[in-house]
Amino acid sequence: MTEGKSSDKPAKRLLALNPKEDAEFQKKVQQVKKRPQTGQTLSPGVLYVGHLPRGLFEPQLKSYFEQFGKVLRLRVSRSKKTGGSKGYGFVEFECDEVAKIVAETMNNYLMGERIIKCHVIPPEKVHEKLFVGSIAGFKKPKYPAVTRYNKTHTEDDVKKVGTKLLSKESKLRKRLAAKGIDYDFPGFAAQIPAKKAPSEANVSVCSEDVTPVCTPSLLERRKSLRVEDDDVDDEIVIKVKPLPENSDDVEESEEESAEEDEGEEEEAA
């Protein structure tokens, strides 16, 4: 508060050390005051900052770098698709000497488990549109194409899309025919389900309709269509005798079967 009040007061009159030379001294002071002020203008310096940790955006970066000097503009590079930070940005300081000091101090500085990379960009390499839109706040992308694609489509929308596709396909076929290209392909028309014939569509399936009656003529017609099985059984049945458990029984059974075969041969003779 005291500094502000003192600055508002007019500057005190300068006095010469020798009172006799005060008149000549005041003339020289007025001449110096009338001279045009040729103060040195500060040239801004642009600083590249890379390997930024997550969660460090424009407000945090500006508040951090303002401890070195006045920050004119700042920009964090973001993705147009997701809106997230790409991990690098640009800071413009009022004085290029301050930018050099910041680059020497912050280069290879560990911040948020990442090593920050900083270097000063030469003025001739700074693009004129580097900081365009840096003052305006970041706006999240709206994704109009994604919302339009994911919305629920009505039957009218599906019909409109189908008609557009068919019209494009017909124009393509005409262009191919005009160029003399004989090329046939199913196209979108094959994917659209065909409409039923009006005769089939008008057939009523109501339960109130009259059901057909089983008349004798209908029953006879059904009987004639049936295939009757043959009464004669031509199947061949082979009977196999069970084998006896003991070996003696096996020999006896073999002898009996041999005798039976001989008897059959004699009868046949």
From Swiss-Prot:
GO cellular component, one term: nucleolus
Domain of life of the organism encoding this protein: Eukaryota
Limits of the RRM domain: 45-123
Chief localization: nucleus
Pfam families membership: hNIFK_binding (PF12196), RRM_1 (PF00076)
Cell location: Nucleus, Nucleolus
PANTHER family, sorted: MKI67 FHA DOMAIN-INTERACTING NUCLEOLAR PHOSPHOPROTEIN
Protein name: MKI67 FHA domain-interacting nucleolar phosphoprotein
Source organism of this protein record: Danio rerio (Zebrafish)
Lineage of the species this protein comes from: Eukaryota, Metazoa, Chordata, Craniata, Vertebrata
Gene: nifk
